[in-house]
UniProtKB/Swiss-Prot annotation:
Record InterPro entries: ELM2_dom, Homeodomain-like_sf, REST_helical, SANT/Myb, SANT_dom, Trans_reg/Corepressor
Species whose genome carries this gene: Gallus gallus
Name assigned to this protein: REST corepressor 3
Residue numbers spanned by region Disordered: 147-219, 337-356
Keywords per UniProt: Coiled coil, Nucleus, Repressor, Transcription, Transcription regulation
One GO CC term on file: histone deacetylase complex
Gene assigned in the entry: RCOR3
Locations listed in the record: Nucleus
Amino acid sequence: MRVGAEYQARIPDFEPGATKYTDKDNGGMLVWSPYHNIPDAKLDEYIAIAKEKHGYNVEQALGMLFWHKHNIEKSLADLPNFTPFPDEWTVEDKVLFEQAFSFHGKSFHRIQQMLPDKTIASLVKYYYSWKKTRSRTSLMDRQARKLANRNNQGDSDDDVEEPHPMDGNDSDYDPKKEAKKEGNNEQPVQTSKIGLGRREYQSLQHRHHSQRSKCRPPKGMYLTQEDVIAVSCSPNAANTILRRLDMELISLKRQVQNAKQVNSALKQKMEGGIEEFKPPESNQKINARWTTEEQLLAVQGAKHSDHSVFRPFTSSTGICSSSHRSHSNFKSATPVTASSTSCCSCSPPSASAAPTTGAIYSAKANPKSASPTAHPPS
């Protein structure tokens, strides 16, 4: 034993005015102190900006304002420089967590994919607080769970077993009732697991989960009772059905490929345009003035052609119309009767047009001397 004055504690003298704890002993940090010069409306606006744009909660936003000595402009400028710790759960976060938990169970890594701003520790912490309050408040979930258990028990014999106390199921029932059920069903479950390996025991545990007892196919895949019966009727039936489905899939892919090729060929044809399919446009213009060569051709055609070939002959020149050509020819020659000045639709000119032919021929041989007798129309 350590006995003596040197082993005793030194007790200081009593001082009535001294405080028990000094400022140095206080390890806490002041994060907010109200300032009377800031109006409440302006403070609420600052908190709203910090929450909506930067994800701060009320305590973090006020702490930033207190750090800058109640200067709102400096606090707003400094808000983007820090990433707040998302510890506050909004109504949207709670709804997303419940939906993610119904899909993935206690797989918090998958739940975090739906709530990326929450850490795993925050998810676990909220899960246990939510689990405690859910059994007291969620009466609708409790009734739905009971009805689901009854339906599962009526559908198959595999789901008749009650939940085991060691399977970690998160039940919404009353803990006292659960304890009674566990005590009553403990012995039959233990006897049924004799001789089972570890894997068989784990598979048996998974069957106790009422929500996970039904194995659903992946998204986009649908199973019917007829298909399941057809597959299970014989050992080779599954391979036969799958081979047939593969052939149908290959044929559908070929049809799609052929349709793509036809569409690409049509697109290439459309890109070429319709210029090659347009009829050629004639650049010749109709001229009302007659040259000497045209007059000679018209007279020769009228002399050597009958009424049936007069129209194609007049269209062979390609410059003047037939009506204008016949009228201008006989008008420029010697005077003739009205019957001789017919167009292409009338009878061919008579013998009275013979002097005109001679005059035109003489005009071609000697233009100077023939100018009084025949001249082209003006």
